[in-house]
Amino acid sequence: MAFLKTLNPLLRRSPTPIPNPRSLLSLDAFLAASSPTAASHATAPAPFAAAAHHHVPIRSGGPLFLSSPPWMLSQSATPLTAAAAALRARLRRARALAGGGAQAVADAVGWEPRRISRDESEVAEAVTGGRERFLNLPNLVSIGRMASGPVIGWMIVNEWYLPAFGTLALSGASDWLDGFLARKMGINSVFGSYLDPLADKVLIGCVAIAMVEKDLLHPGLVGLVVVRDLLLVGGAVYKRASSLGWKWNSWSDFVNLDAIHREKVKPLFISKVNTVFQLMLVAAALLQPEFGTEETQNYITVLSWLVASTTIASTVGYGIKYRQIRPRR
């Protein structure tokens, strides 16, 4: 207590006044302490001495106008409104990415998904699903029947008549099997409607040409069948090109019948009858070298005339159908 009484008079007689602790936190004190000439001009009056009684606390990291005098503010300082808006935008993005879902993310970034029309969605679905439609089980059966044609022809040329007959019987049964599977599986493939008759034509053509080589069928009859099949295949290609307006980006677009301009091929009834007679004729002619007689040869002759007549009738029928559906210019 005596020490404090002794110290108090000494402090009052001191020539250097002790600054007020609150003034040390004022704006003028901060500027004086941070100025390089603060030591030499400590007693000089401040230019804005009139405002020295306003003591503003220093807030580190706050806005610029609280930490600098007006003449030192930069024009590039970020306004509070812009900073607050940017902060709110960042918070929205953070909440969206943290678990707000796809719609919240879209709202945060200002993205609006484009509405896809029904036609565009159907085309996209057909294009992306083209491989699945092409590689279904009924189409694979048709492809197998088509591939068996050259194999059976090779067997006939090498006089393997019985193996050729057995393979032909299986291939003929597959003509019924692919349609049965398509109905049971609910598959309605436009490509399959083209592939099924094409497989029949390749099979019959390869077998018939090989049988002409071995004098098992008349060349005129085989020529009639082959020409008719070529005309039908050419007509199918022409029909597909016409449906596309003779414009397509690539051959994949042309052969992808399940994508755009879907139009199935519907064979005539007379054409189905012709296919049955052709298979019967080829099977009977294959058995003729091993088990044939003069009587069976007569049956083969009758079947040959039936095949010729139904071939001509189906060709005429397709010609009439083409003229009916052909657009008039």
UniProtKB/Swiss-Prot annotation:
Molecular function in Gene Ontology: cardiolipin synthase (CMP-forming); cardiolipin synthase activity; CDP-diacylglycerol-glycerol-3-phosphate 3-phosphatidyltransferase activity; manganese ion binding
GO CC aspect terms: chloroplast membrane; mitochondrial inner membrane; mitochondrion
UniProt keyword Lipid biosynthesis present: yes
EC number: 2.7.8.5
Enzymatic reactions: a CDP-1,2-diacyl-sn-glycerol + sn-glycerol 3-phosphate = a 1,2-diacyl-sn-glycero-3-phospho-(1'-sn-glycero-3'-phosphate) + CMP + H(+)
Pathway per the UniProt entry: Phospholipid metabolism; phosphatidylglycerol biosynthesis; phosphatidylglycerol from CDP-diacylglycerol: step 1/2
Organelle transit peptide residues: 1-38
Cofactor(s) the protein needs: Mn(2+)
Residues passing through the membrane, by range: 150-170, 190-210, 217-237, 300-320
Family named by the database record: Belongs to the CDP-alcohol phosphatidyltransferase class-I family.
Function text: Catalyzes the committed step to the synthesis of the acidic phospholipids. Transfers specifically a phosphatidyl group from CDP-diacylglycerol to glycerol-3-phosphate to form phosphatidylglycerophosphate.
Name the record gives this protein: CDP-diacylglycerol--glycerol-3-phosphate 3-phosphatidyltransferase 1, chloroplastic
Species for this entry: Oryza sativa subsp. japonica
